[in-house]
Amino acid sequence: MFNYQSFAEVFAFDPECSYDEETVSMIERNRKDMEGLFIDRVVKETGIVRPAKHYPPKSNNGFRTLHKAIIESSGADHTKISILYYLLLTFDFPTGKRDYSLALEQSTFLPQKYQIFMKGLWHMDRKEFEAAVQYLTHPSLIPTFADEILEVLVRKSKDDLTLALAYYHTAQPTLTSRSAIECFFSAIARTSVTDAFYFTRSQPQHSQQHMFEMLVSVVLNNSPKDLVADRSLELVSLPLSLEENAWFEEYLLYGDGRALKKSKDTVLMRKIGTGNFIDALSMRGINSRSIGNLDWNNLSDGIKHGLGPRIDG
């Protein structure tokens, strides 16, 4: 019977095996660039506190030491085998085949969901994100390391959120870290004001106001110049509840948002857009310039003319 605790059996294809220098350098470079590898997180689950001390192994002796540390750890058998499977994927890569990892799959009866998950993490660690997402969104998987996966996909996206959104909408993970939530949310807000707005509503009640204010800030402060008018119009046209509208005005008129460019103008835009003309006219002293092709002084004159005697009613 196959014994995964035997180094000679796991690495029967070459008991003197080791990674070449280029592979070791790539692994170390990616660990630094991504602030940690996903295999590090799996290894830590076995009780090994410092994965970087063992991985990547720089020699055959290093491989034997790593194997011994995994086997003697307190991790579950399927976790230990999954780590060994991950190691074999790297040996498979130069051959263009799956001989080594397949042999371990068959010898240990490693469940398919663990194979799929480890392949996903392996591609993440190689920064092959498109391939990684294909594995990590497999319906057999329960989202694991979702916060970290999403943060990496966003930060390494180069402003293309296709993969991050595909992972989020397909895997439907429950994000738990504030860092991941805000990272993902700010990325959505840069892409679609409306999508970001509905994302705020999907969050716990206690965090909705903070995220709504983030959305307003991103739109007014971080939109490209050629898009700020359109994005501002999209913002003021959102179907806000009474509470959200109160947050909107409080943030832009009295809160931290009052320091943003066009903060008062944006409130005025919403009042006009929602037909609240009397309140719009009550906003004296804005003294603003135009946003896009809109000049608020001219608009005020137009509103007064349109309302006529109703202003005094």
Model-identified regions with their sequence ranges:
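Extended alpha-helical solenoid/arm regions of large eukaryotic scaffolding proteins
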Residues: 1-313
